[in-house]
Amino acid sequence: MLEPEFWVAVAFVIFCGIVWKAGGFDQIINGLDRRGERVRRELEEARRLREEAAALLADYQKRRGEAEREAEAIVANARAEAERAAAEGHARLNDFVARRTKAAEAKIAQAEAQAAAEVRAAAAEAAVRVSETILREKVTGDAAQDLIRRSLGDIRTRLRA
């Protein structure tokens, strides 16, 4: 009975009795309860934060998807607008070339007509001079001179028309 283990056990039982009598176990239990309550609140806070983070992530992903779709729509619209502008520019260029070609053809036709008229006029003038020269050599007298003048005037009018 005088063994040290025995006295350690007796001292422990007496200590536990004193602690129990002083309300130490209640304090330990209350402390553990408070700690458990604090842990439970922290877990609830963590759960709430996790749900909030999940909601924010979902919102972010939704907005990112919307932004990507909007960007794709903007790019598609820009591409369509560029193609339309290119087609419009091409059409304007073709129209410009067609108008210039038509104007050039009209100028060429006018120049051809003017050249043909000048050639006819020159040919008529040459024919009148040749006719006048021939008639003056062949026909003589006042009546002949009057006839030559009338004939040459008539020839000039007909050749110029």
From Swiss-Prot:
Keywords: ATP synthesis, Cell inner membrane, Cell membrane, CF(0), Hydrogen ion transport, Ion transport, Membrane, Transmembrane, Transmembrane helix, Transport. One of its GO terms (molecular function) is proton-transporting ATPase activity, rotational mechanism. One of its GO terms (cellular component) is proton-transporting ATP synthase complex. The chain crosses the membrane at residues 5-25. The keyword NAD does not apply. Signal peptide: none annotated. Its main location: membrane. It is a single-pass membrane protein. F-type ATPases have 2 components, F(1) - the catalytic core - and F(0) - the membrane proton channel. F(1) has five subunits: alpha(3), beta(3), gamma(1), delta(1), epsilon(1). F(0) has three main subunits: a(1), b(2) and c(10-14). The alpha and beta chains form an alternating ring which encloses part of the gamma chain. F(1) is attached to F(0) by a central stalk formed by the gamma and epsilon chains, while a peripheral stalk is formed by the delta and b chains. F(1)F(0) ATP synthase produces ATP from ADP in the presence of a proton or sodium gradient. F-type ATPases consist of two structural domains, F(1) containing the extramembraneous catalytic core and F(0) containing the membrane proton channel, linked together by a central stalk and a peripheral stalk. During catalysis, ATP synthesis in the catalytic domain of F(1) is coupled via a rotary mechanism of the central stalk subunits to proton translocation. This is ATP synthase subunit b 1.
